[in-house]
Amino acid sequence: VAGLAAGMLLVSPQPASAANLVTNPGFETDGTDGMPYCWEKSGWGDNDFTFSTVADSHSGSKAMKVTLTRRVDGDRKALITESATCAPVVTAGKQYDLGLWYKSTTPDTAITLFRHDTTAGWQYWTDLKTLDMAAGWTQASVRTPAVPAGTDRITWGVSVYGTGSATTDDYTMEQVSDPIPPATCTATADECANGRWDVLPTQNPVRSMHSVVLNNGKVLLIAGSGNSEENFDAGTFTSAVYDPVKGTYKVIPTPKDMFCSGHVQLADGRVLVMSGNKAFPVAGGHGYEGYKDSYIFDPVTETYSKTNDLNDGHWYPSATELGNGDVISFGGLREDSTGSVTAERWSAAQQQWLPLWQVNQTWSYWGLYPSMILMQDGRLFYSGSHVFGNGTPGTGSAIYDYDANTVTAIPGLQDKDERDQSASVLLPPAQDQKVLTIGGGNIDSNPEANRLTDIIDLKAANPAYTVGPQIPQGTVDLGNGKVAETGNQGKMYVSAVLLPDGKVLETGGGLHNRANPVFEASMFDPATSTFDPVAADPEARGYHSSAFLLPDGRVMATGDNPGNGTWNHNVSIYTPPYLLKGTRPTITSVIDNEWVYGDTQRITVDRPIVKAELI
């Protein structure tokens, strides 16, 4: 399933047991006696008839045609086979929605049902609906009565009881969901409305500025030197793996200073880490330097292994996974402290960084940590979120087309030179292709961080940012305790977290560069383009902080590295309101663990649900 960089896909609301119970619903699989698999000829009376599989289908390559050329009495119908293999299992007392596509040259047709009584066997149940004549493909749907007691299976199809023909295809049968129980608050009224933050009793043992939720449910926390020159000089580089279920940390060996590297989760769950800190600045000499090394972290062995080198150094690079599993990386500082203009591409097929001559280059300087979002058509959207840059070519926003090797400027981003340390997120559902950019400041002039948000529709013919709602204000610590924000005071260092209810939690931040933490959190609803203030993290979360969704639906926040060089090792956990409204549905089965884009997948849960999200 795609990671956060790929956004969130909305699954159309379906009942908890919404799965097509009809086997071979489009007649594509052949059976015996000239009939498709799991379908049989049925009927009675004095009439002349034919059953045929025809190419004139609604979808696929086949449809079923039943024709009566003479009739005195009786009917003919293609029914789901009355067998334990083919007849759908039903539950007494439940109702089922039946659907099909049809064409008909006769008004004498009906959807007919039979049921299997556990004592008496198969018997006629009811005719549910007469189908109107239709020259073109027409959809018909009907809901069954409650299944009678003692019934364990049903079968059904279209009866033809007059001269003419009925051609049918694409049958569906889904159990009607039970009524959704009303939400029941399981905490205080305020917590049920705004959620709750808890500070964990155990601290994060490393100074991690990078966080990755792994495919096994654990969290990789990468520190490297943790922005500590003392650790760097001593060669002390660390990472930790946090287990949210056990509440434990495991510190693991880390081969290089991955402080301010780039990273991305690969399709198989491993984590690709690129570049990092080769050297701290020297007074009167060089600045930060980025190295060319790259590593892969394996969640199974919890170890790093080296890949081939990048073509250039990249301290503070971006990393975006493409649709084919390749990774493209831009920006950051080179080994000589200058800005890198080299694009890098990781080949999923070759499991290596490609040599320079195999990578398209525009020789653009994208700044540091440029926020690159994969678009549905394969291009990349640079949102304008970045760090450490005033008026550099990497400010503003643009669309980058790797295949065409072009960069197209995108207008509309407010105060583009004051979006340092802002956040950008592909809003749910991802297929809507809208991006929200939140807050920011400027490391050079260091003004008060702003409350600005901007929204862009990347599916528009000529995409451009439009003004979004302002970030709600909270409290700020200006050095003498928390006071209410005033005027246009906003925040930089914002974290934006996609939630499974389709909303986005924005949390954390600071009013100035590495100073004055802001205590505010709110939910952004993409459906209404509004913010709703919620409970705020009691811990400072500024520079080198992160917040992310845990597999159980809670949000974890960690880190803060103010200008005095200290580190906040406290970890906060946010419980959103949706976890405080009654018993949670549980996924009981998933057919396939690996999904292809466009697949139809079946997930079973233990209680009625309204919708599901892929994150």
Language-model segments: residues:
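Compositionally biased, intrinsically disordered low-complexity segments
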Residues: 4, 25, 150, 593-594
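Extracellular and organelle-lumenal recognition/adhesion modules and their flexible linkers in secreted
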Residues: 18-186
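Short, functionally important structural connectors and interaction interfaces within domains
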Residues: 2-3, 158, 302
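Secretory targeting and sorting signals
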Residues: 1-18
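Alpha-helix initiation/capping motif
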Residues: 5, 36, 148, 177, ...
